Structure formats: structure tokens, C-alpha cells
Amino acid sequence: MKTVKIALLGFGTVSQGTFNLLQDNVDLITNRSGVTIEISKIFVRNPDKYTNITLPSTAQYVTNIDDVLNDESIAIVVELMGGTTFAKDCVEAALKHGKSVVTANKDLLAEAGPYLFDLAYKNHVDLRFEASVLGGIPIIRTLYDSLGGNRITELVGIMNGTTNFILSKMTDEGLSYGDVLKEAQDLGYAEADPTADVEGLDAARKLAILASISFNRRIFFEDVTVEGITNIDTEDISFGKEFGYNIKLIGIAKESSKGLSLNVYPAFVPLTHPLASVRGSYNAIYIKGNGIDDAMFYGRGAGSLPTGSSVVSDIMEVAKNVAFESTGRFKPFYFDQKNIYSPGKIQSSYYMRLAVDNKTGVLAKFATKLAEQKISVLSIVQRNKDPETAVLAIVTSKCPHSYILNLIDSFNSLRSVKDVCSVIRIMEA
């Protein structure tokens, strides 16, 4: 049986999860892959931090990346450091040295994925990245392999566990955004600086990677229109329940004859849709294809062992390719023109919450403004906040986003409108 040597770059949460699975399941992994996978080197800045971890006799810590790159016996470099600068240098150098790479680095792939895939192909090595999106959910290989014969028309998902935890808590317990964010930070679900999660940036990077595979285009993070959850209020969630919706931060990529739309935003999801029941820190991705019809994949989107499981899966696959001298067969998957569809033209139904004067005749004025924008009202609820102020919650018919922006301006021009408090898209069932 052939032995394939690997090197781990970084030894943080995901890397240690990968290490533990490789050690704990060594017999299973060897029998299933037909290859002995041997950890040879672990690149770290300070080995003294890891004195409590017992390495196998084959492995050693190194502090110079050249000790990995120049070691011809190492066939696979597993990049688990994160970041887009030094990590990119390491991945690029490894590929040029004829080493296959496994990475969980979504930021790097969203920024430089097409270049790195081309580089891997030119050097006849593999670049695998299952763990870069949705952690333990095996969605990457599913898209380019299991669903390779399908024309994907739409993918929509809950791609960030932190925001789903926050919104689930706000929904289930009626807590404010600020209170739940603090709890998420205390539990380790959210970083001290939660910007990447709560502003939708993390989900946008994942969507860029998934859309690249699904629609065969060079999609970058900058192509995704992004809106976060920081303005979501418990009052909106309460109205949403009344209308039959749960609030979720979704990433959605959809192809039509007009082009490809790429968006991350908070949306009301109908309770009849499977994504509405995804709670806590779990992730899910819902796919529509012309062969599979509809399918949903659900699981842990982060964590040491769930993400490590996806990393090990890639290591096993690449190790088999190394053993049979068949690396570099994975051709870059983008061959169609990008043609991104303007966000202003995307049609959705919308929920709007307004604070207005509690007087007769106000609704008639709203009806006039709605008619001017050719927007119909599907549902409306009024709650009297105090003798002078009423709160209106409106669900509109489907219309382009540009129409809603014009409607907001029209509402703001009315003296009877005190505030357009929130505007939230409604996902189709």
C-alpha cells in the first residue's frame, strides 16, 4: 500500500479537528482510501503553544514554510491558516512546486479562486476546497460531481451559522439583536468583531464560490450584492410570524434569460419552505436543477470536527489521485460569460413597516402612492402604538427592487409618514 505524505499549514481549530480525525480514524481512512496518509510536517509560528498535543512519530513542527515547500516527499499541502496574503503565497508556491493543495479558506478562494484553479490545472495537481463552504455539509463535490449533469437554475441557502443563531434566538425568545449578539459572542459563535458575519460578508464569499461552480462562471466576492441583519427588529419578526414567515439571512444565486443574480440579504421565508425550519447555528442549502428538481442539504456549517471532516474527505480523494498518478484532472469549471443581472431589476414581494399618523385618510394616501408605482398590496396589518401613532405592516405584490426604492421616496414625501422603519424581501415559497 502506498504512503502519501501531507503537511498541515496552521494548527488552529479546524487543523486540530483534521489532525484528530486522521489519527482517530486512521484504520478506517486507510481501508476506504487504499492509501496510508502520513502527517509529515505541521507549519506553525510557535511550536511551544502545542506541547499538550502528542504528534505521531512521523510528524514534526516546522516554523519555516520552505521546509514544507522544498520537501519533495510531501505530496499534499493542507492550508488551514486563513487569510488572503500569506496563505495565498503558500498555496501558490505549493502548486508551483507540484504539490496538491487542500484548503478550507473561503476568503482566499472568493478573492483568487479562478487564478489558483488555473494554476493547479497547469501544474497537473489538485486543488480541493470542500471545507471552504458550509463546513461539514458536502456541497462542493455534490455540485461539480454528483449534480454535474444538471443545469442548476437556483441555489438559496442559510450560509452563516452566527446570523442564523442570532435570528433564531430573536424569533424564538423575542430578544433584541444586541442582547443575542452578546450571547453569541459569549458562546463563541460570534467573533469580538462580528462584522463579517452580521453584515453578510461571510455568506457573500461562500455564495461566490458556490455560484462559480453551479453556473460555470468566474464569480468574485465583489459580484455579490450584500445586506446584513443589523437593522432587523423584533417588531418585524413579530409581524412576520403573523404573515406566516420566519426571518433568515439568505444567500441566493439565480439564473434567468436576463442573466445571473447574486444577493445576500435578510428575507422572510414562508413557513412552508424547508429553509424556514433551519434553527440555531445550522446551515442549509436548497438547490433547483433541471434533473434533480429540488434538493436540500443540511448540517453543521462550522466547528472543528464538522469542518475537519470535509478537509479529511478532500485529503483522502487527493491521496488516491497521488497514489495512482492521476492528479490535475479537475478542469476549471468556468466557461460561460458572467452577465450579472442588475439588483434593481430583481423582482420580489416586500414587507414594509411604517410609523404613521393615527388619523383617518392615511391609508387612502398610501393607496395612491402604491398605485403610482404600480404596486399592489397583498396584506396589511395596523397596530396602534399610541393615540397619535399607528404602525402599518404591508406585504406587497412582486415588483422590481427599483420600484420599492421609488415607493420609499414617495412615502417619505408624505407628512403623515413619521418613518419608513424597515423594508424586507420575501422569498418565494
Task: Annotate each language-model stretch with its function.
Residues 11:
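Glycine-rich Rossmann-fold phosphate-binding loop(s) that bind the pyrophosphate
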Residues 15-16:
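N-terminal Rossmann-fold NAD(P) dinucleotide-binding loop
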Residues 25-53:
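NAD(P)-binding Rossmann-fold cofactor-contacting core
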Residues 63-104:
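Rossmann-fold NAD(P) dinucleotide-binding segment
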Residues 74, 121-202, 209:
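Rossmann-like NAD(P)H-binding beta-loop-alpha module
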Residues 310, 315-429:
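A conserved regulatory-domain signal marking ACT and ACT-like small-molecule sensing domains
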